Amino acid sequence: MKKMKVDLAVIGGGPAGMAAALEAKRQGVEKVIIIERDKKLGGILQQCIHDGFGIQRFGERLAGTEYAQRFIDQIKESDIEVLLETMVIEMTPEKEIYACSGKHGMVYLTCGAIVAAMGCRERTASQVLLYGKRPAGVYTAGSVQRFINMEGYLPGKEAVILGSGDIGLIMARRMTLEGIKVKGVYEVMSSPGGLTRNIVQCLEDYEIPLTLSATVKEIHGKERIEGVTVAKLDENREVIEGTEEYIACDLLVLAVGLIPENELSKGAGIPLDAKTKGPVLDENFMTDIPGIFAAGNVSVVYDLVDYVSQSGEIAARGAAAYLSGKDRGEKESNEVVAGENVNFVVPEKIRRGEKEEVSFFLRVTKPLKKIKVEVVQNGARSEEHTSELQSPIHLVCRL
């Protein structure tokens, strides 16, 4: 067994993990290591060849691969150690990591601090209760994206997409450009799940129909999918009888949401937020276990990669403060409460006297325009913010 002792271990080499490792080095943390299960750094950005990344951070419209490469280049120039093709199988409350690697075999690390940046995973057909057989041709949007962009395969000729999340919208355009006929996008909610710019650029510009308050009722086919039955939904999301329609297709793409990947967190006994499905965090993005931090989509599914990177930097600064003894997470905390029309807020708690400025990431419960956000502290309104965005919202407040 290979044994290592590090100051900071970052689990995951995606945008959050890379940003966290680089920021930790800037904060003076000496021995930093990234543990990544894939062959390369970059995470999901490896298969994102469309543009729109980095507008806030770099002021440019970069492809996902370009965005990732900027961080990879910085890591190569640093003394950050990277373990690729290494799978973490356990993280303990004592900040120990057990991993396995084809090159090193079993790896055991004792860490001064840990940043968990494992990202998120896609919901599958079984998690959204799709009825019918289990034929070939039913894929998550991320799988289709990898097939086309990285492996050079077309998974079908005629497609139906269930869900209007951003990756599903982007793949509607991508499949159209590759010659696949996208017959429609169906969304169970009464409003689209993706960003407005993706609705316009990926659907409207290519005349791909979007049907709201609708779902796939049944999958048809035995060996290979032959078609689906779609139907309209009422306000209770129940199928409206008589609205069923059969659509022939050989590909069903599921873009039905993402779930933070927290099996390691649960194994370490870290409490999770029922709304975000990620760890409960303070303003340093430290979990309820001192010295273990969370960043990126492992804590909440962000809409923009810029926010993912920013969360990694917040966690890294918190880890550096923890390692130096400046902030060991011992002070009493106040709960952050999501008020009217707010679905959730990250962080979920603030430690008294820790900081003057705190970054909040929040999402509304329903699409809104010209948003006014009130921040109430000790019963009195301390700040008011306005935004034209529906979601996401990022606030920097002085408390």
Predicted feature locations:
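Single conserved hydrophobic/aromatic residue that forms the stacking wall/gate
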Residues: 385-399
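Mid-to-C-terminal Rossmann-like scaffold of FAD/NAD(P)H-dependent oxidoreductases
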Residues: 306, 314, 318-384
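A Rossmann-like FAD-binding core segment of flavoenzymes
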Residues: 70-99, 176-263, 356-384
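FAD-site-proximal beta/loop scaffold in flavoenzymes
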Residues: 116, 138-148, 251-302
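Predominantly flavin-linked oxidoreductase catalytic cores and closely associated redox partners
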Residues: 106-107, 116-210, 217-224, 298-303
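FAD-binding core/adjacent interface of flavoenzyme oxidoreductases
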Residues: 1-11, 69-158, 234-242, 253, ...
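Helical hairpin unit composed of two closely spaced alpha helices linked by a short loop
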Residues: 280-281, 292, 311-314, 318-321
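Beta1-alpha1 glycine-rich phosphate/pyrophosphate-binding loop at the start
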Residues: 6-70, 155-201
